[in-house]
Structures are given as C-alpha cells and as structure tokens.
Amino acid sequence: MTEIYDFDKSAWDIKGPIAPIQPTTYSDGRLVPQVRVIDPGLGDRKDECSMYMFLLGVVEDSDPLGPPIGRAFGSLPLGVGRSTAKPEKLLKEATELDIVVRRTAGLNEKLVFYNNTPLTLLTPWRKVLTTGSVFNANQVCNAVNLIPLDTPQRFRVVYMSITRLSDNGYYTVPRRMLEFRSVNAVAFNLLVTLRIDKAIGPGKIIDNTEQLPEATFMVHIGNFRRKKSEVYSADYCKMKIEKMGLVFALGGIGGTSLHIRSTGKMSKTLHAQLGFKKTLCYPLMDINEDLNRLLWRSRCKIVRIQAVLQPSVPQEFRIYDDVIINDDQGLFKVL
C-alpha cells in the first residue's frame, strides 16, 4: 500500500528555481558562449571557492578545412575544483579547449573525451580534461546515434554551468544503498514535480506560467525498519519525516540535481544508511537521464515535493540485470 505525504512549499521556496540559459547567436549563426552560476546551499562552508563545473556544447566534425558540421548537443561534467577566478574567465578558457570526442561501447554506448590544450585557470579540473574521461553516452549526449565513427569529432564548448558548493559538504548516497531492500521495511521515496520553461529566446514572455509543462522524478532516500518482524505504520513514518526538517534546492551537479538538507532529527537507522550525512545530492544524470538532458538549458523550478511511503521491494524479486539469454534454448532465463 502506498501512502503520500505533501511537504510545505516553504521547504524549497528559496532555492527551488534554476534560471535558464537563453540562447543568443552571432551574425553568422554561432551560439554566443554563456556561463550560469547556481548556489543551492545555505552558505555554512568556510571555504567559498569550491565549485562543480559542467560544460555544454556541440559535438561536431573536426575538419580544419571547412565549416564544422554539428552532429549532436552534448555535455562534459568536469567535477569539483577550487578556484577564485571569475566565471567569465573560466568560460573563456573553456571555449578555447581542443576536446576530442570518440564514440565507443562497453556494457552500453560510451563517449570518450580528452583535451589537447594546456590548462591555466582550469588546472583544478585537470584530472578529467588531461587524463580523459568516459561516460555513458545517453547521459552526456542527446543524439549519440548521429555521431559518426569514420570522421574525427570534437566537443566545442558553448555554455558553462557552475554550482557553488557553499554548504558544508554534499554527499552522494552510494548506489548499493539506493538498491538496498529489506524485509518488513517501509521505503521512503520522494516524488518531485518540476515546472519546465524551455529557453525560448530573449524578450519572449510566457503569460500563464501555470500552463508550462511539468515533469516528475523519484528518488529513494532510505528505509524505515524495525528491529522486530513488525512494520512501522505510515503515520509513524510521516512523524519521523516531519522531525527531519528537510529543506530542498536545485543545483547543477551533472546537469540538474536535487539537494536535500536535514535541519532536524533523523532516525539512527536512516542516518546510518545515508553514511551519517545530513546534506545529500541526487544528480538527475543518474536518476533520470532523459529528463536531465531536457533540463540542460531550461528554466525549471520545484512546484511540489511529496514523500512516498511504500513497502520495500522483497529481496526475492529479480531485477533486470538477473535476466540473461539461455544459450541452449534461445530463451530468456531468470537466474
């Protein structure tokens, strides 16, 4: 049985929206580079120069003899670095990078990125830029099927998104814990509703924001579980959630991310599941890659957050990764 509990909008009023990147072009049609700075935190970190950097751009043919042919729109997450440089100067250096892109495959399709340009201001992000990086193609590209293999490709940076890490630490919940299932436990999930306003160009105004499209995504926080074989009631779980004093914000980790901070009391079991952290980060890049790509340049804001209490999925249930093809019979087989 599923129970739903609505959070008061005051829990996300301050840091709920993200401003869009409005596309503007030069006279020849090329996009004008822009930078966006997001601060989803409350400002209690002593070191104010830590930031997460995320690049957006065009995957195009690397042909010095003619005008480049754009193949797809892509992104390159650079991760966390420390810098006191102005965002505009960081953007300028990023647009001068010579980033090579290569399409390959592993468990799924991949994109490989590596940079051939010496770094100065972007040195704090050298591990990704100099050493190279590989990503799930669907997480960082909107149309990987259009990227050819027989023509060298480059990633031309157009936009930069910087997320200032002003909170005293963000914690990404380990994947094993997110997949943890327990007998007689109540799963605590969040259903987040976003209102999306795509970048439609400068000077254009949406008269009725209520008519803008909405999208939802769901994240798993943890499980409420009693030591005995009994199950907590929904009302008791709701009381525990209210005591946590959750505050929500949107950031730019991996594109768009949900940031959660507990300002109250958290149950010992749940606190342990979350690595004894009270400031959490859930990148949509990992949760819902399709929605994340849609939000790369869009204005969006939180309009509703609901706690969803559900029975934990039984451990005997098989997940998709446990299904293989039986070579003997040519049929799907559940291990």
UniProtKB/Swiss-Prot annotation:
Does the keyword field hold Membrane? Answer: yes
What does the sequence similarity comment in the record state about its family?
Belongs to the morbillivirus/respirovirus/rubulavirus M protein family.
Q: What is this protein called?
A: Matrix protein
Instruction: Name the InterPro entries on file.
Output: Matrix_C, Matrix_N, Matrix_Paramyxo_C, Matrix_Paramyxo_N
Q: From the UniProt record, which GO molecular function terms apply?
A: lipid binding; structural constituent of virion
What is annotated about its quaternary structure and interactions? Homodimer. Dimerization is critical for virion formation. Interacts with host ANP32B.
Identify the keywords attached in UniProt to this record, alphabetized: Host cell membrane, Host membrane, Host-virus interaction, Lipid-binding, Membrane, Viral envelope protein, Viral matrix protein, Virion
Q: Give each disulfide bond as a residue pair.
A: none
**Gene Ontology terms: cellular component:** host cell plasma membrane; membrane; viral envelope
What GO biological process terms does the UniProt entry carry, in alphabetical order?
virion assembly
Q: What the protein does? A: The M protein has a crucial role in virus assembly and interacts with the RNP complex as well as with the viral membrane. Associates with phosphatidylserine (PS) and phosphatidylinositol 4,5-bisphosphate (PIP2) at the plasma membrane. Interaction with PIP2 triggers matrix protein lattice polymerization. Matrix proteins induce host membrane deformation and curvature necessary for virion assembly/budding.
Which compartment or compartments is the protein found in?
Virion; Host cell membrane
Q: Does the keyword section mention DNA-binding?
A: no
